[in-house]
Design a protein with these regions (language model features):
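Short hydrophobic alpha-helices and adjacent helix-cap/hinge residues
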Residues: 2-135
């Protein structure tokens, strides 16, 4: 499954770009455990440098006046100017957010929904280049 994502973007001279989109703070135990194992494994599978961009949705949600659109704009502002090679929403809220705003943020980028409860994805049709690892 990860190998399929690894082959999508072809050869590049610049490091690949992978977005880890956390539902909660990165120090949240299950997110941290996943990311700690995932980053080196993905780097090993790609066999080339990867720049990991890590964004937590919780910080944006703590602002009571933040609308979903303002959160989307905040996420967009952290993304690199170059195209992402992989988007990895971690947890249910991040998966729902990524699927909802996929067209505005990363319409053609492969997405690996990680550590997601089935209830967060069962009623949403995945894009052709989406894969979910549900719990």
């Amino acid at each position: 499954m990860i190998l399929a994502c690894a082959s999508v973007s072809g050869a590049q001279t610049q490091p690949r770009q992978a977005l880890l989109l956390y539902s909660y703070e990165r120090d949240f135990a299950s997110h941290n455990a996943f990311a700690t194992m995932f980053r080196p494994e993905l780097s090993r599978l790609f066999g080339e440098p990867i720049d990991f961009i890590e964004v937590s949705l919780q910080a944006a949600r703590l602002n009571p006046s933040a609308s979903e659109e303002s959160i989307m704009n905040e996420v967009r502002s952290t993304l690199p100017r170059r195209r992402l090679d992989l988007v990895v929403p971690i947890g249910g809220p991040a998966a729902v957010f990524a699927q909802k705003y996929r067209q505005q943020l990363f319409p053609t980028t492969p997405m690996l929904l990680a550590g997601v409860d089935r209830r967060f994805v069962q009623n949403r049709a995945p894009a052709a280049n989406d894969t979910a690892v549900t719990v």
